[in-house]
From Swiss-Prot:
Membrane-related topology note: Multi-pass membrane protein
Keyword Lipid metabolism: no
Segments passing through the bilayer: 40-60, 64-84, 114-134, 143-163, 194-214, 234-254
Family: Belongs to the CobS family.
One of the record's GO molecular function terms: cobalamin 5'-phosphate synthase activity
Cofactor(s) required for function per UniProt: Mg(2+)
Protein name: Adenosylcobinamide-GDP ribazoletransferase
A UniProt-annotated Pfam family: CobS
EC number of the protein: 2.7.8.26
Job description of the protein: Joins adenosylcobinamide-GDP and alpha-ribazole to generate adenosylcobalamin (Ado-cobalamin). Also synthesizes adenosylcobalamin 5'-phosphate from adenosylcobinamide-GDP and alpha-ribazole 5'-phosphate.
Compartments reported by the entry: Cell inner membrane
Species name: Ralstonia pickettii (strain 12J)
Catalysed reactions listed for this entry: alpha-ribazole + adenosylcob(III)inamide-GDP = adenosylcob(III)alamin + GMP + H(+); alpha-ribazole 5'-phosphate + adenosylcob(III)inamide-GDP = adenosylcob(III)alamin 5'-phosphate + GMP + H(+)
């Protein structure tokens, strides 16, 4: 019973940390609880993707404009998550684009103000996502599943960096979840991330996973070269990049 309670609290911890959804006061907050919650991060992707799909479907029932429905669904996910991962993308873009040493990059990334590189990166990411999803609109069911799959699998791939990379900044919101991830937690996160992809067939899911493994390896090497490891912002940037790659791959698969 205690083990079940711990998992339940870990799930609620993940919900409270990565969304704006209020969680029961009894959940509390602890470093150990947040680390245990890592395996459930892809399930937050299920939740965010399901909200996006529901909003898209509802808007499309009222306005026959697929681009508008996609835009509103994206806005709903930004409200739900507080643009948590987009903020990480912006911070990384500013730091990597404007810093000349690892120390400079970390200092810029820690600055809450957004710069030109960050603004451009977020705008490009949102535009690409809007265009990719809009292109999926003819696939009425496929686009709904793609929303869930992209949010889930991208979070699984991003959090897997905690399995192999060291955290390089002592302060910051994501520090408590920056301990090395256990293999058992990584396995569960991987399962939660891959399951929605299987709707498109095992071959498609396998190709997406192979692409994510390659992209994760390249991005991890980039982080190490630029700042010597990872930060919470790096995980946000990784999630955004992986989400775009997944949508790109799914669109190519559905269009073939």
């Amino acid at each position: 019973m205690n083990a079940l309670r711990e998992h339940w609290q870990a799930l609620w911890t993940a919900v409270g940390y990565f969304t704006r959804i209020p969680v029961p006061a009894s959940v509390g907050f602890s470093q150990a609880g947040l680390n245990r919650a890592a395996r459930y991060f892809p399930l937050i992707g299920w939740l965010v993707g399901a909200v996006a799909a529901a909003v898209y479907w509802l808007v499309l029932r009222t306005v026959p404009a697929q681009g508008v429905a996609v835009a509103v669904s994206m806005g709903a996910t930004l409200l739900l998550t507080g643009a948590f991962h987009e903020d990480g993308l912006a911070d990384c873009a500013d730091g990597f684009g404007g810093g000349y040493t690892p120390e400079d990059r970390l200092r810029i990334m820690h600055d809450s103000r957004i710069g030109a590189f960050g603004a451009i990166a977020v705008c490009m990411a949102l535009l690409l996502k809007w265009q990719l999803l809009s292109a999926m609109a003819p696939h009425s069911i496929g686009i709904l599943v793609a929303m869930v799959a992209a949010h889930a699998a991208s979070r699984a791939a991003a959090v897997s960096h905690l399995l192999t990379h060291d955290y390089v900044r002592a302060e910051g919101k994501a520090k408590p979840v920056a301990q090395r991830m256990r293999w058992s937690d990584a396995l569960w996160a991987g399962v939660f991330g891959v399951v929605p992809l299987l709707w498109f067939g095992p071959m498609c899911a396998a190709l997406i996973v192979v692409g994510l493994i390659l992209a994760r390896w390249l991005l991890g090497r980039y982080f190490v070269r630029r700042i010597g490891g990872i930060t919470g912002d790096c995980l946000g940037m990784a999630q955004q990049i992986f989400e775009l790659l997944i949508l790109w791959g799914l669109l190519a698969w559905m269009s073939s």
